[in-house]
Amino acid sequence: MADAHSDGRTGSTTPGKITRPETTGTKNTHSDNASTSAPGNSASASASASASASTSTLHSNSSTTTSSPQRMINHNPSTSSLRNINTGGTRIETGTGRGTGAVQNAALTGAALAFSNAMGKATPVVPNKFAGKTQLGGNGLGGKDGALAAATKVRVGGGGSPNNGGGRTRSPSKVSVTDPGMGGEQQIYGYQKVGRERTGESETDGGSVISGGLEYQGGQRIPQKRNQRPNGHLLPPFSGTSETSPNVKNNSAAFMAANLAAKRSRENSPSHTGQNYGMGMGMGKQASPLPSRRQSYASSIDSTDRRVDLSSIPPTSNLVEMWEQPDKGVKKERGLVSNRGNEIVNRQVQKRPVSSHAPIPVLKPAGLTRPVSSHASESSVQSRIASSQAPISEQVKSKPKPVIHPRPSSSQASVPGPSKPVSKPDVQPPPVSSHTTSSEAPKPSPKPPVQKPAIYNTRPASSHGPVPNLSTKPSIQKLSRPVSSHGPPPAKPSAKPSLQSIRPTSSHTLESTESSSKASVQKPSLPPPRRTPANLSVSGDQSTSLPMHAPQPRSMQSPILTTADRTEPASESPTQSPRSSSTTKTPRRSSKPTLPSRPPVSRQSYNNDADDDESSDDSFVSASSQPKPKSPSFRAKIAEQKRLQTSTYAPSMTAKTLSNAMVAGYLASSRASTPSISPGVIQPPAPPPPRRLKKFFHSEHSRTPTPPQNTLSATGVPTMKTTMRKPKTEKELKEEEGEGEKRRAKKHLVKKHPNKHDEGNRKRWRDEITEKERKRYEALWASNKGLFPYTMDPRGEIIEIEGAADTVPGMVVKDLWERSRLGGDVLEEVWELVHGKGYWGRQKQKRFGRLERDEFVVGLWLIDQRLKGRKLPARVNHSLWASAS
């Protein structure tokens, strides 16, 4: 299959190795029934945008001539587990058996030529038309038809293998372009590797930086921000130089092939060959910047895409025409209608920043965004896309000239304004290419895109995802990947703010959106942009403004999405704000794209696939000649940082893991609660002790002394001492109990009203002081007796008081009694009752204001009684004095 093809630009032939992954449709759930043969003149090139479920690799080893910088295009998705994206695309089988091998070879050659054209920067590749089946090997691929055939062939099952289970064998094998001079092979995800300029770490295709996510520079991955380019759109790759030359037609054909090959390779292979090394400076896009992630993506995408891709496959001519008609093919940013054969892959330019703020209304494009979760919708969209593609293909057929290739047009953007877009905006719902202001590619006019440069379709990179907001808001200008502006940036696109809202129009069917952005601008038919903030500001430099699709937050992504799927989440989430669709390695944010707060986590990680396409697509978007391969943008760096994080925690975001966590939490809480006491063991609380029957009329007899506090309670448990006093002896306890019994014995059988005067039962002053009380009072007396034994007689002489040693001076008594806080009148009354033995004729004057032991004890007792609430007696009984002495 080695065939030297003259480079459309340089005419030099360089052997290129084209390896195309043959996708085994093991997981390909989508079977596209539409199988048609390409026009005879195009050698029945069948661009089968069939979803390749698995990353089986068909290595079509073919030596193709790439642009003057010799590059080898390796469709090696299998090795680099690119994600196989089942996009509703038309699978077109031209011929059966090995007959398709030639077509595939031709497609590969076309892709190589397209990329080489971008590389050539001067002359777009002009694939030679191949009559009948063009084979890269013995068969020469030439002319735009050759590109078409090449694209067709690329999509045809590897080696002409029929679609898996009749489903499209979509093995968009990654095209890895190896520049021998650059060193290392470059894999091109998108059709955008045209005119790739390698500067520094990143490469610019047509002035647009294509980053597979992380570029290996010096064998080291360099996260570079990619402009999210609409994966589904076949936008004219911008060559490093203006591709305004007449080769644009060829370039469009090559473009179609390249786009097909790149996207398919990207979609089909779960991960790019991890072996890809940055060319030269490491600027070549790494086929598998994140092979592992790509593999996971591929697996998830395979399942989801295949699931979604249910629509019939439109004829290959539709795909080709879509490409050739800048109006149609171009605008589908992610959901390239013709490009992926109704692949509703819509990998929207959602760089898939995991935390993309607003989910881009990816679902809007009818199948434009292929939400991973919404398969049914995708299938319907695919069908719509297929239908739209059919007319597009017809237009393309009618137009032998490669009408301004949607992407070539942007590469050809050298023409200041998009000339009449040849392709009619057939299904141009709201022009999807609203992303780029320059996506104002000239409306596809029935006439062939004569003014190729005019048709920028500056890759309506966002055509896939964000439907162009009619507002001119330059919110997320496509990170204008400086598509190597082929010449003067398209004046019209710059002049007109692409009203296209970032949100992709309802479907890839918005091929019409691919039609000149003018059509999109003029046609406010666009569904109201769901997210205006991403509206593309029309900037003279379309390259500078690429609408960014806000990467859908992972949470929005269906748990089904694996990391690979996450590359598509924006497209999946209808509400995601479009992130700069062409977030190329060095996406230029002329107008700050409204990036979701979280930088695309895995813009490079899981956008490696989508980003490649996006970068290529978006790069084509801007015709401005700014192929600056900027160093990885800040977003790219952040994405790289978060890529690792997302790879770790993303799996936990699935519904299964969440449910498991919930159940685990519930079980843990239930098991942790009082493990020692099982529910059965828990005993009901003991019933409250029965209340004592209260007497209706409580009498004073019911009063009982405070129960004695024993050192040991009845249960033998020692009770805490409340004071420093000695515990009560048994004798004391018995005495107290006896008193209580005596009182209780006096209960009356007949209850009387408490208010009735019962003279006989009235409590009187106790007649005696208990032994306990007496001892306490005597102790206090003993400690204070004998103080101040001297006094002064009337003559002023100091004399000793008789019996002073056994008495307490009145001054000390007053001090002690006042501690009871009783009133002075009460204390005075008590003093009168006890001093000199009361009123019993004692000679108080002889006492000299001192109290003897019994007097002091009785006085303390009276004070205690008064503190207890009892009234002081009128006189102290003899019994009381007797008990005190």
Curated annotation (Swiss-Prot):
GO-annotated biological processes: lipid metabolic process
KW Lipid metabolism (keyword) present: yes
Keyword Mitochondrion: no
Gly residues composition-biased segments: 156-168
Polar residues composition-biased segments: 9-32, 69-83, 293-302, 339-348, 469-478, 534-546
Biased composition regions of type Basic residues, renumbered to the chain: 743-755
Region (Disordered): 1-98, 154-246, 262-652, 671-694, 723-762
Domain EH per the UniProt entry, residue ranges: 773-879
Compositional bias segments (type: Basic and acidic residues): 325-335
Annotated Low complexity bias: 33-68, 84-95, 373-383, 414-425, 505-517, 573-585, 618-633
Keywords tagged on the record: Lipid metabolism
Function summary: Positive regulator of phosphatidylinositol 4,5-bisphosphate turnover and negatively regulates signaling through the cell integrity pathway. Involved in rDNA silencing.
Sequence similarity: Belongs to the IRS4 family.
Protein name: Increased rDNA silencing protein 4
Record organism: Botryotinia fuckeliana (strain B05.10) (Noble rot fungus)
Organism classification: Eukaryota, Fungi, Dikarya, Ascomycota, Pezizomycotina
